[in-house]
Amino acid sequence: MSVINVEHISKLYGDKMILEDLSCSVDEGDKIGIIGINGTGKSTLLRIIAGEEEADEGKIIFSNGMTIGWMGQNPEFDEESSILKYVCEGKKIEDDYGYESDAKAMLTVLELENFDEKIKNLSGGQKKRAALCKVLLQKPDILI
């Protein structure tokens, strides 16, 4: 069963056609990769699917109730924030649903168990893992 249907997507930047009449579908359980040379619309397509950007033409259709988790190429960070505060941003840290304990468990798996460490002290790879944790904690049906 298709969970994402991309139908006739086109995107123009200035006078350059980045995506032209692109159609494809993603079935439940699929893991896909998009490859190509620079400037061919890979990131643009993903941003359109994630709702971060609008297509000039076409549409994206999702199965009912599907949620999207988006981790862009350059996530934004509050460099003074702790790792735990960053991944729980927008959530009550100590809520009745165990969000903080879920966050700590996932951060430990991702080898970021120093929860009070400031984001500014992390390496690039550690920052990417923190951003991934933040997205995964939302329990999206689809991760982009």
Language-model features: where?
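ABC ATP-binding cassette signature C-motif
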Residues: 1-144
